[in-house]
């Protein structure tokens, strides 16, 4: 007796069933068709990508993803979540009458490729370009509808020419606070030359511009330029051989990449004066359609606070502090400066003053020794570590005393690592009775405290008896009077206003606004990044390259790695890879400034990996323009301000929430500079932001804590085993190193791309993280099989639809689905859209018999944004020769969307006595009549009188008896 394979027998009986093989053939064929026809090419209003006026005349929609870094590992199924979502949304927008721009480039500069090059000897460009090609293949297989003419990589010289050009616009600009905008630096020079603006001197006097040397002029302009080089404390990572921005350092003071120790070092670095835009970056958040959580992160990062600057005299120098509580000045009993404060050396005496407490000295013989030792200690901590609420407060007395400007008292001056040079002025007045950190510091160093805000509890006004500081605004000021001013009895708000006015009148301070935001550290000691278009003359003055010399291409070097050091050796400094190519570094150039050929030295730092992503939305608009950053008409068309979008920008930008204070803030800054200078009409880059969740996966670890291959783990009785050993399971990230990565290639091979697309969109709300389950993918595959069967005979391959009119029940199901799916796709609720499609498809399947053509065609159009390949195939089988991509999305007939009947509950004394099927449009008067006439209601009343009838048509009648 022979045995048969049921699956094989089934395929023989149904040779035209939708299978993985059929899906693969369909998908490859339609992807080729889309490429050949330019299906997703969005026309510009002008230029080389101009297209048909009819399409350009449609309302536009610019949809963007945060573009990927081309990793050597390729994509796992978590990566395409956002790409599929934007593709579904873009397809829906095309079908609802929009000219849709949707494309994808590659963010290709950065440390990973450089590290790979160091390890393998492969040039970063070679490995990066290979990774890009691999990723393009993976992305194409997903059926993403991108305009491929607009794609690029940030490593393309034609692209980074304009990154360099933008840098030069920023370098050659200054922020005019009166005009509240950036202006060309040439206009500032003209003001200096004419005498309209004075050139300040350190002693407060002024000088004429003509009296300044070239170096002095460069120094003056450096104080104004929006891109400038300066010596400043930076985060130096010897293990990486480069400096890091604050955002690239973890909370425990280590590098985000590589987990190396990070130290504070003083180095000359390029910075972007993003702080000039702090107010606008804050204020313009209100016009953006962004998640409130992201807005809050940006607001907190910018950190606007109102207060006063106050001068404390120390040995003939004025040390300025910023405080948000000038009303507590009488309570300032000591000062604390950042260890790096430049005035510390000036007022540190040779010996300890008489009577210095031992606890203040740190055990050192002299103030200079104490200061030097503490500075070295502080340099080993990151800003995050320094500001952490550590139990033990550290610091050291400088040996100097300052004068409290309101009380005239002498207060000791300390340095401590919890004060940062980059925030405020790098100095604070300490009011320990009313600040938690100051209180802890005062207790640790046996410093005096004075209560100047009356506690609202019963602790009294002697801080020496308190367990903690009293920090409240809802109280009155006490112990705050001198011969010249008294704040006693005032509320906090009134006291702040009075003391600020007094400080300004006396020339001791002024009201001001401070920001937590710091200028953006913009240089890296790496090879694989954009070269700076800057050269230095023999006097060390920085000069911009003329536009004709752009792009300044990255040269070949034999060794790509920055010089790295012992990760724990703080006494090191950077050596850049580019500095080793002397033929490239030392050049003779004619910069067109009238001086003729001169010898110069190129800048050997490179730009950070954020540079290329600060403006890429603009390059998508006009990707082949070699004369302008972007054609103004094209930028205005796609990104210009319009109703509901007063600052312009991309219509939808989808990406991870982890970029809240890095890429998103930097891109906003660049856009505002370009807007101010008249290069673009959009003051904001991204109008609407959507953060997708994360696709998670289970990580399995053995007894050593080492990840084991998830695919080889077995489940038995609720426990998990790998090669017979019990392992732990924890939900986390998906990745190659965690041995739990599933590639889209695997799923596409087993089920097809449309199934993968549906599964990722159906897993849950797009903005919520969710666990991957390969076993559940088959559910969406079966949905597509049922869809196929509703149109195609599996045995013959013939189309089975009929031209008959659908019945009432089918029409209602169809139009409810159309209405719901349309709303869900517009709102990016893709999981519920798929649920509605599934419900309609299942109803048609259960009904049996052939599906009416009008219903089948509408169903295919509903599916098209979600599963475009099978939709194209079925659309073609239904007799249409044109692509489904530009068909009109179905519109629901309101008559069929409203339920034919709804259930009305009738209550007597709050208890349900009857349920009635009534029209949803029934009036309250009619519903009351129907309810009172119902036999069950009549029986329940039993002849009792009715005091009141409460009607809420069409769903409730409540009868109150007499």
From Swiss-Prot:
Residues 559-582 are annotated as: Disordered. Keywords: Aminoacyl-tRNA synthetase, ATP-binding, Cytoplasm, Ligase, Nucleotide-binding, Protein biosynthesis. It comes from Streptomyces avermitilis (strain ATCC 31267 / DSM 46492 / JCM 5070 / NBRC 14893 / NCIMB 12804 / NRRL 8165 / MA-4680). Belongs to the class-I aminoacyl-tRNA synthetase family. GO terms for biological process: leucyl-tRNA aminoacylation. It catalyses: tRNA(Leu) + L-leucine + ATP = L-leucyl-tRNA(Leu) + AMP + diphosphate. This is Leucine--tRNA ligase. Residues 570-579 have a biased composition (Polar residues). Its EC number is 6.1.1.4. It is found in: Cytoplasm. A motif ('KMSKS' region) lies at residues 733-737. GO terms for molecular function: aminoacyl-tRNA deacylase activity; ATP binding; leucine-tRNA ligase activity. One of its GO terms (cellular component) is cytosol. A motif ('HIGH' region) lies at residues 68-79. ATP binds at residue 736. It is an enzyme of class 6 (ligase).
């Amino acid at each position: 007796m022979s045995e048969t394979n049921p699956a094989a027998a089934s395929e023989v009986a149904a040779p035209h069933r939708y299978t993985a093989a059929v899906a693969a053939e369909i998908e490859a064929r339609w992807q080729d068709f889309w490429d050949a026809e330019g299906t997703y090419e969005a026309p510009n209003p002008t230029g080389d990508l101009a297209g048909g006026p009819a399409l350009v005349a449609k309302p536009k929609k610019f949809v963007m993803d945060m573009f990927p870094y081309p990793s050597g590992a390729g994509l796992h199924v978590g990566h395409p979540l956002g790409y599929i979502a934007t593709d579904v949304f873009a397809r829906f927008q095309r079908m609802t009458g929009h000219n849709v721009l949707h494309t994808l480039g590659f963010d290709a500069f950065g440390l990973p490729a450089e590290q790979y090059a160091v390890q393998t000897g492969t040039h970063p460009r070679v490995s990066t370009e290979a990774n890009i090609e691999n990723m393009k293949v993976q992305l194409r297989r997903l059926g993403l509808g991108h305009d491929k003419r607009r794609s690029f990589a940030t490593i393309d010289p034609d692209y980074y020419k304009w990154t360099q050009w933008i840098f030069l616009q920023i370098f050659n600009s200054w922020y005019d606070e009166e005009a509240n905008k950036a202006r060309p630096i040439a206009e500032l020079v003209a003001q200096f030359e004419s005498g309209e603006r004075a050139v300040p001197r350190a002693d407060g006097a002024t000088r004429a511009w003509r009296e300044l040397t070239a170096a002095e002029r460069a120094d003056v302009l450096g104080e104004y330029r929006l891109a400038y080089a300066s010596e400043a404390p930076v985060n130096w990572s010897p293990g990486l051989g480069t400096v890091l921005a604050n955002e690239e350092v973890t909370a425990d003071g280590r590098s985000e990449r590589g987990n190396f120790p990070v130290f504070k070092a003083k180095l000359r670095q390029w910075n972007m004066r993003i702080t000039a835009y702090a107010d606008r970056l804050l204020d313009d958040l209100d016009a953006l359609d962004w998640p409130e959580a992201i807005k809050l992160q940006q607001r907190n990062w910018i950190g606007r606070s109102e207060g006063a600057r106050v001068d404390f005299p120390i040995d003939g120098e004025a040390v300025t502090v910023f405080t948000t509580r000038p009303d507590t000045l009488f309570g300032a009993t000591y000062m604390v400066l950042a260890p790096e404060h430049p005035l510390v050396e000036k007022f540190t005496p040779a010996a300890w003053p008489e009577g210095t407490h031992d606890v203040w000295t740190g055990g050192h013989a002299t103030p200079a020794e104490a200061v030097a030792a503490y500075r070295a200690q502080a340099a080993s901590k990151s800003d995050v570590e320094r500001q952490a609420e550590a139990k033990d407060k550290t610091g050291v007395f400088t040996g100097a005393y300052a004068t409290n400007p309101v009380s005239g008292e002498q207060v000791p001056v300390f340095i401590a690592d919890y004060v940062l040079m980059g925030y405020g002025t790098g100095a604070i007045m300490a009011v320990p009775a009313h600040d938690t950190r100051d209180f802890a510091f005062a207790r640790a160093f046996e410093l005096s405290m004075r209560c100047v805000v009356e506690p609202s509890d019963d602790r009294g006004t002697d801080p020496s008896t308190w367990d903690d500081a009293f920090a409240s605004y809802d109280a009155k000021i006490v112990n705050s009077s001198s011969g010249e001013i008294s704040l006693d009895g005032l509320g906090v708000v009134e006291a702040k206003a009075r003391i600020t006015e007094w400080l300004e009148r006396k020339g001791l301070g002024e009201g001001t606004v401070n920001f937590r935001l710091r200028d953006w550290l913009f240089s890296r000691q790496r090879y694989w990044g954009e070269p700076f278009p800057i050269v230095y003359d023999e006097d060390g003055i920085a000069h911009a390259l003329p536009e004709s010399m752009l792009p300044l291409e990255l040269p070949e070097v034999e060794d790509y790695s920055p010089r790295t050091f012992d990760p724990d050796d703080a006494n090191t400094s950077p050596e850049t890879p580019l500095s080793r190519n002397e033929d490239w570094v030392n050049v003779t150039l004619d910069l067109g400034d009238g001086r003729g050929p001169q010898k110069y030295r190129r800048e050997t730092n490179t730009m950070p990996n954020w540079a290329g992503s600060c403006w890429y939305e603009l390059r998508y608009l006009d990707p082949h323009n070699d004369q302008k950053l972007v054609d103004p008409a094209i930028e205005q068309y796609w990104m210009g301000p319009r109703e509901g979008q007063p600052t312009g920008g991309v219509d939808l930008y989808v990406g991870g929430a982890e970029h809240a204070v890095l890429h998103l803030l930097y891109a906003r800054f660049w856009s505002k500079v370009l807007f101010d200078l008249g290069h673009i009409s959009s003051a904001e880059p991204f109008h609407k932001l959507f953060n997708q969740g994360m696709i998670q996966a289970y990580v399995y670890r053995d007894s050593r804590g080492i990840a084991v291959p998830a695919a080889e783990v077995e489940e038995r009785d609720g426990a998990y085993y790998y090669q017979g050993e019990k392992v732990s399971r924890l939900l986390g990230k998906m990745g190659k190193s965690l041995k739990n990565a599933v590639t889209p290639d695997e799923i596409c091979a087993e089920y097809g791309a449309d199934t993968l697309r549906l599964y990722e969109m159906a897993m849950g709300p797009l903005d919520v993280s969710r666990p991957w389950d390969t076993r559940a993918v088959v559910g969406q595959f079966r949905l597509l099989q049922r869809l196929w069967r509703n149109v195609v005979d599996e045995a013959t391959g013939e189309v089975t639809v009929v031209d008959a009119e659908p019945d009432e029940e089918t029409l209602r199901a169809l139009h409810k689905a159309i209405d719901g799916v349309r709303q869900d796709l517009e709102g990016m609720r893709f999981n519920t859209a798929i649920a509605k499609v599934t419900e309609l498809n299942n109803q048609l399947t259960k009904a049996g018999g052939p599906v009416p053509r009008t219903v089948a065609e509408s169903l295919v159009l509903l599916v098209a944004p979600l599963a475009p390949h099978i939709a194209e195939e079925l659309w073609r089988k239904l007799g249409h020769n044109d692509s489904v991509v530009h068909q009109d999305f179905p519109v629901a007939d309101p008559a069929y969307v409203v339920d034919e009947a709804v259930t009305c509950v009738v209550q007597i004394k709050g208890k349900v006595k009857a349920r009635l099927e009534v029209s949803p449009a029934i009036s309250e008067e009619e519903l009351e009549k129907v309810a009172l006439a119902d036999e069950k209601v009549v029986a329940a009343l039993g002849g009792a009188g009715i005091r009141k009838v409460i009607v809420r048509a069409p769903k409730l009648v409540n009868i109150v008896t007499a």
